[in-house]
Structures are given as structure tokens and as C-alpha cells.
Amino acid sequence: MISMLNQQVELKPILKFQITQIYSHSLIQEIKALITRLVLQVWRRPATLMAGIIQPLLWLILFGGLFYNAPINLFTINTSYNCFLSSGIIIFTSFTGALNSGLPLMFDREFGFLNRLLTAPLVSRTSIILSSATFMTCISLIQVVFIVTASLFMGNSPLNSDSTMIFGLMILLVTVGVTMLSLALSFTLPGHIELLAFILVVNLPFLFSSTALAPLYFMPPWLQLIASLNPLSYAIEGTRYLYSSVNWNFTECVIKISWGDICLGQIIILLIALDIMAAYLVSNILKAKLN
């Protein structure tokens, strides 16, 4: 009897369910749930998606109509200005859509929803960034598809299967790189006013300092230098090369700049390198902010 009293009795509740199963969501499930939330936001308020389609479409129609009677050989050989412009507007559409990708996350910060996510028992806080990046990349690609379709009705010839793969790769690289930078800005800047101001300041200068609206040799020397440093110029010229060449290859010269000739393969390597640099920069910023 004494030995039984000396024994320690451990009381345990009888559970009818396993608590660990409630919080055992994988990273993919978290990303899927967060993307579903963002999809519902766009479904209920599609104005942002429509604006991202209408704005570049107006550029394509109105600016293309402005130079409708321009000589065929004025900008490039045997190419109308509408065909010349469409490549620039396609890249500009992906750039603009990706640049706005930090706004939903910024509003989540200001309205307190991000704090709820950070205090939730997530498998990884990286799912917050991956879901936003994946969703905004898909939105930008949807906008690009609409602009590509519109450009076909304005005289652009459709790409073949191989050209479409390289074209899609360049669009994806531009979109992912700019999306990561925009998400980093949404954590760095104090509010949505500053982020909107940054977008307004950066958007049009990047367009006019690239080869989207005019070829490089039309520009003064100082603007040629700026356009040569603009990554959008390389993506635009690569897209333009795919549209204008049937038998394209990775080693043929695409754009001539002051320090050498750039081929299609070098453009893709450059875009990949810029994405890697952006990913490294953004990862360091997000680690500091999320932790």
C-alpha cells in the first residue's frame, strides 16, 4: 500500500482527435490556401486585372496609330511600326504587372492581416512570399497573353513552338525578377503611398529609356547609354528578334551596343543572372523583416 502511494501518477487527457494533424499542413497546402485567398480578392474586385490589360492595350492602339503611316523601313527592315511596338508593349506589360505585385502585401501589412499570418502556426513563413510571387506572376502572364493576342490582330505573325518557349522564358524571367523586387519593397517602404510613388516614378522612365518605342540608333548618345544599361531593352530586343526571324538561333546578334554585340543566348543568361541577384537581395531583406 505504501509503495503504491509513493508512485507518481501522471494524468493525461483523453483526446478524441489528434492535435498534430490540425497543424500538419505542408508548405504546398499553405501556398495553395494563400493563393486561393488572393484569387478570391481578384474575383470580387477585378478592376486591377482589367486595368493591367487596358493600359498596355491603349499604348498599343494609340501609340501604334500615331505612327501608322510611318514608312515600313523607318524603324526596322520590312517591319511596320505596330509590329515593332508590340514587342516593347508585351515586355512593358509584364514589367508593369510585376512592379505592382507588392501592393496586395503592402495592404495586408497596413490592415493587420500580415501580422495574423506571422503569428499563425505556419510550417514556414516563406509560404507568404511564395504565394504572393506565384499569384502575381500568373496575373502578369495572363495580362501578357491578352496583349499578345491583341498584337496578332494588329499584324504580328504568330510564333512557332520553339520561339514560343524562348519567348515565354524571357517573359517569365522578367516577371519573376521584378516581382521579387516589388515584394521586397513592400516590406521595406513604410506604406502604400511610398510604394505607389515609387511605381509611378519608375514605370514610365523605364519605358522611355528602353528600346520599346524606338530603336537604339534613334536616340542621342546619352540615352543610348542609359538604354544599354536597361534590362528591359535586352528582353524587348530578344522578343523582337523572335518575332522577326523564322530561322533564329542563340548566337546571332540581336542588339548592338557600344561595348559589343549581344546575342539571344547572352540575353537569356543576363536575365537569369539578374534574377539570381534579385533573389539573393530579396532573401536577405525578407529574412531580416520576417524574423
Swiss-Prot record:
Identification of the protein by name: Putative transport permease ycf38
PROSITE patterns attached to this UniProt entry: ABC_TM2
Gene Ontology CC, one term: chloroplast membrane
Bilayer topology: Multi-pass membrane protein
Gene name linked to the record: ycf38
TM region(s), chain numbering: 47-67, 87-107, 135-155, 165-185, 195-215, 262-282
Family label: Belongs to the ABC-2 integral membrane protein family.
Record GO terms (molecular function): ABC-type transporter activity
Lineage top rank: taxon: Eukaryota
UniProt-annotated location(s): Plastid, Chloroplast membrane
Domain ABC transmembrane type-2: 47-289
